[in-house]
C-alpha cells in the first residue's frame, strides 16, 4: 500500500512540474536582458531600444514598449520551434500559411498577413497588389513589424509635415532621428 502511495505522490509531482513549467525567454538575464543588456541602457549604436534607440527615441524609457518590456519576452509563447512539415526537397524552416480555397469572380483582399519570403499561386490568375518583407534581428528573435498610425493628427496625411503617422517632417527631408513617430521606433509605442 505504501508503494502505491509513493508512486501516486511521485506521479503527481511529475504532472505538476510538467503543467507549471514554461520557457520565459531564449536569453538569460545575465546575457542580454539586464538593465545594461540589449534592450536596456547599453547596446550597439548607443542605447538601443531604451532611452535612445539606434536612430531616435526608441520604444520607451529603458525597455521596449514602455517600462516593463515586451510581453513576448515574458510570456510562455517563446519556446521551441513550431514543427512544420513539407514535401519539398528543401527542409522547412518556418511557419507556412496555405489556402486550398477556390476563388471565382472578383476578389478584393485587404489587410496584413505576415510572410517571410515567398508567396506561391498556381494556375492563371491576374493579380494586382503589393507585399513587404521586414526581418528584424539582434537578439535571435525574428519578428514581423507593422507600423500603424500615430495618435497625433497629421498635417498632410500619412507622410505628413506635422506630427503625423510617419514622423515630424517630410520623409525625404528629415534626418533619421526624426523618422517614424517622433524617433524611429516611436516615443513609447506609437505615441
UniProtKB/Swiss-Prot annotation:
Pfam families: Chorion_1. Transmembrane segments: none annotated. Residues 1-21 form the signal peptide. One of its GO terms (biological process) is chorion-containing eggshell formation. GO terms for cellular component: egg chorion. Keywords: Repeat, Signal. InterPro entries: Chorion. One of its GO terms (molecular function) is structural constituent of egg chorion. It comes from the Eukaryota. This protein is one of many from the eggshell of the gypsy moth. Belongs to the chorion protein family. This is Chorion class B protein Ld10. It comes from Lymantria dispar.
Amino acid at each position: 500500500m505504501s508503494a502505491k502511495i509513493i508512486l501516486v505522490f511521485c506521479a503527481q509531482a511529475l504532472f505538476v512540474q510538467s503543467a507549471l513549467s514554461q520557457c520565459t525567454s531564449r536569453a538569460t538575464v545575465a546575457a542580454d536582458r539586464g538593465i545594461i543588456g540589449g534592450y536596456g541602457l547599453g547596446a550597439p549604436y548607443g542605447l538601443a531600444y531604451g532611452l535612445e534607440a539606434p536612430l531616435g527615441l526608441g520604444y520607451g524609457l529603458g525597455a521596449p514598449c514602455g517600462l516593463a518590456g515586451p510581453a513576448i519576452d515574458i510570456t510562455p509563447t517563446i519556446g521551441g520551434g513550431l514543427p512544420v512539415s513539407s514535401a519539398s526537397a528543401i527542409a522547412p524552416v518556418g511557419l507556412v500559411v496555405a489556402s486550398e480555397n477556390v476563388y471565382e469572380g472578383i476578389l478584393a483582399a485587404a489587410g496584413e498577413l505576415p510572410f517571410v519570403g515567398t508567396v506561391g499561386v498556381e494556375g492563371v490568375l491576374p493579380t494586382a497588389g503589393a507585399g513587404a518583407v521586414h526581418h528584424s534581428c539582434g537578439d535571435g528573435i525574428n519578428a514581423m513589424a507593422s507600423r500603424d498610425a500615430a495618435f497625433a493628427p497629421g498635417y498632410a496625411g500619412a507622410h505628413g509635415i506635422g506630427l503625423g503617422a510617419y514622423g515630424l517632417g517630410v520623409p525625404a527631408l528629415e534626418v533619421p532621428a526624426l523618422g517614424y513617430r517622433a524617433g524611429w521606433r516611436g516615443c513609447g509605442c506609437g505615441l
